[in-house]
A protein has these predicted regions:
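Phosphate-coordinating loops and pocket residues in cytosolic domains that bind phosphorylated ligands
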Residues: 51, 200, 209
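C-terminal helix/juxtamembrane-tail motif
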Residues: 213-230
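GST-like domain detector, emphasizing the conserved glutathione-binding G-site
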Residues: 1-145, 225, 230
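GST-like fold's C-terminal all-alpha helical module
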Residues: 100-200
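Long, amphipathic alpha-helical surface segments
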Residues: 197-205, 219
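Charged, solvent-exposed alpha-helical segments that act as regulatory interaction surfaces
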Residues: 84-87, 168-172, 204
Length: 230
């Protein structure tokens, strides 16, 4: 059984930028993997961490002599544990995976601004709406690249978590978007279908988090930022 140690920035940040690694490890497609998760506060990393990982980046994977940073690099590395023919990357190819990572990045920045800051603007809301529209047009269906689950799905889907909360933030920034969450979300019908499908994947169900949990985490982060600014 392979052993690996994964260092992640924060328990809840795994839901945002490293949940894809958790889902990959528990996908059932790979052989059983044991791994230790060490959760770090990105604003107060312990002194030993830079000695282990000079870049001090998260997420970070330590496996035997391998030290890897960046979620895309870690995902591709872990994906090969069962062999190239069985890899999820082979289902989408490098091009499809890069496309998914680029879309995920385009969602991540405005999503973060809307959720975790008090200075989000209508421009941030528009950027997220444009990113979701691009995703809606790109999904081949039923999965991101077609008929089978691929590494591309695990790259993009974590950024569609806490959906109703994020849609609510959009409404706050742009009241012309619709009267309620359902109205604004209806702009992206393929994304909605995709979310329903992916939410039923065993690896997602096993690692899913409740919307209330995410909201509490957002409140904690916003309150800490406000306190630090005093």
């Amino acid at each position: 059984m392979k052993m690996c140690r994964m260092l992640l920035a924060n328990a809840k940040l795994t839901n945002v930028d490293a949940k894809n690694i958790d889902w990959l490890i528990t996908s059932g497609i790979l052989p059983p993997l044991r791994y230790d998760r060490i959760l770090l506060d990105p604003s107060a990393k312990p002194g030993w961490y830079p000695r282990l990982n000079p870049s001090a980046q998260v997420p970070f994977l330590l496996y035997r002599t391998e030290k890897l940073s960046d979620s895309d690099v870690i995902m591709k590395y872990v994906d090969l544990f069962k062999g190239e023919e069985a890899s999820l990357l082979s289902k989408c190819g490098e091009e499809g995976f890069k496309m998914a990572m680029d879309l995920a990045s385009s969602i991540a920045t405005p999503r973060y601004k809307l959720c975790f800051t008090k200075d989000a603007t209508k421009e941030d809301a528009d950027a997220l709406k444009n990113a979701l529209s691009n995703l809606d047009q790109t999904i081949k269906g039923p999965y991101f690249m077609g008929e089978t689950l691929s590494l591309a799905d695990l790259a993009v889907f974590p950024f569609l978590n806490a959906w109703e909360f994020v849609m609510g933030r959009l409404l706050q920034m742009d009241d012309a978007s619709g009267d309620n969450v359902d109205a604004i979300a209806s702009q992206w019908p393929r994304v909605l279908e995709y979310r329903q499908l992916m939410s039923k994947e065993p690896c997602v169900e096993q690692n899913a988090f409740q919307e209330e949990e995410f909201i509490k985490f957002v409140d904690d982060i916003v309150n800490k930022k406000a306190a630090a600014a005093l």
